[in-house]
Amino acid sequence: MMVLLAGRHEQDALSPRGRALLSLSVGFVASVFAGSGFLLGLVREDLHFQCSFHQMGSDDPGSFYCADGISYIGVGVATYGVYGVILLIALGIAMADLKSSGMQSRLLAGISILPIAMFSWSTWYATSSRPIDQAPGANYWIQPLLPVTAVLVTAVIVILAAGLIPRPRLRTAGFRLAMALFVAAALIQPGSLSAVAVTLGTLAAAVCLEWRVPDEVETPTVTSARKPL
């Protein structure tokens, strides 16, 4: 009996749903432990959030004086609170018994965009709410975030376009292309890793669930009505 239960547990763990749940968990853990430090560096050193700009005389080019690390705890709590909610929603979809596996993977692919949207909005907010003693005429968003934003937007467009493809194999190829773009985005701007890791985990879960879909064009079921003879 124990052997049968162990065999069934191993089979469930290696199933597409088991791999999807594992991908979601690994993505969130990587975001917390690998991405939080890079996120703090981006917010503090590049975006100068909660920093003040001071000049000691007319010849001084000026420098930033930022808050200590404890002052940024709120940033982490807010960021990972949102990511945690996204994770719970994704886990619920992955564990749900939906009739259409293709729709299930599409939903996860759509949810994978949410961490990127959160990252984009929060970095915009961090650079838009500037105190009056910041360097005049400076834009702290363009240099650290414009290149990575272009890559992230491209990846999101690929996800949306792939979701419209009826063939599961081609749809999976689109999701994998988006995953490669997200990896490139994290290399361009390591501060985006906190969002990219959650997105990659969710998108990998969508790819895992695609393996349950037959490789054929998905068409709606049409019931033909015949008149009785």
Labelled PLM ranges:
Residues 1-103:
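N-terminal topogenic module of multi-pass integral membrane proteins
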Residues 1-8, 220-229:
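Short, intrinsically disordered terminal tails adjacent to the first/last structured region
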Residues 106-110, 134-161:
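Membrane-interfacial catalytic/cofactor-binding modules of polytopic membrane enzymes
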Residues 38-79, 120-149, 185-199:
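Membrane interfacial helix motifs at helix-loop boundaries and amphipathic/re-entrant anchors
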Residues 28-29, 101-124, 175-189, 227-229:
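Transmembrane alpha-helical segments of multi-pass membrane proteins
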Residues 10-20, 88-110, 155-179, 183, ...:
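Cytoplasmic membrane-interface segments at the C-terminal ends of transmembrane helices
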Residues 81-89, 116-124, 147-159:
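Generic alpha-helical transmembrane segments
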Residues 73-86, 131-136, 157-163, 198-210:
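Juxtamembrane/interfacial segments around transmembrane helices
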